[in-house]
């Protein structure tokens, strides 16, 4: 599912909201998650999961084409840990 499909699904299930309103809401939610992570905050959506930022140390990597050693700088990467409800839902038979 892509963002536009999510917006359409929410709009279909909430006829009192226009698609433009739903799009603004969805974009605001994503933007707030991104801003919180940029500040280093953790974002928890109970049952669904939690977004956080992890630091990766600098390291020596390899260019897959040439095999040459390449310095990879330290960086921050987003991390998502699934919530119990999501895990249970995915593993029901």
Swiss-Prot record:
The keyword DNA-binding is assigned to this record: yes
Family matches, as CDD domains: IHF_B
PROSITE patterns (UniProt xref): HISTONE_LIKE
Chain coiled-coil ranges: none
Any single Gene Ontology cellular-component annotation: chromosome
InterPro entries: Hist_DNA-bd (IPR000119), Histone-like_DNA-bd_CS (IPR020816), IHF-like_DNA-bd_dom_sf (IPR010992), IHF_beta (IPR005685)
GO molecular function terms noted in the UniProt entry: DNA binding; structural constituent of chromatin
One GO biological process term: regulation of DNA-templated transcription
Keywords, comma-separated and alphabetical: DNA recombination, DNA-binding, Transcription, Transcription regulation, Translation regulation
One Pfam family linked to the record: Bac_DNA_binding
Subunit text: Heterodimer of an alpha and a beta chain.
Function according to Swiss-Prot or TrEMBL: This protein is one of the two subunits of integration host factor, a specific DNA-binding protein that functions in genetic recombination as well as in transcriptional and translational control.
Family: Belongs to the bacterial histone-like protein family.
Protein name as annotated: Integration host factor subunit beta
């Amino acid at each position: 599912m892509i963002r536009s499909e999510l917006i359409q699904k929410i709009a279909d299930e909430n006829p009192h909201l226009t698609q433009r309103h739903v799009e603004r809401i969805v974009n605001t939610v994503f933007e707030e998650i991104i801003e919180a992570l940029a500040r280093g905050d953790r974002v928890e959506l109970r049952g669904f999961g939690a977004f956080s930022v992890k630091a990766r140390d600098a390291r020596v990597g390899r260019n897959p084409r040439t095999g040459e050693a390449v310095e990879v700088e330290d960086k921050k990467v987003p991390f998502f840990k699934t919530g119990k409800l999501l895990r249970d839902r995915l593993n029901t038979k």
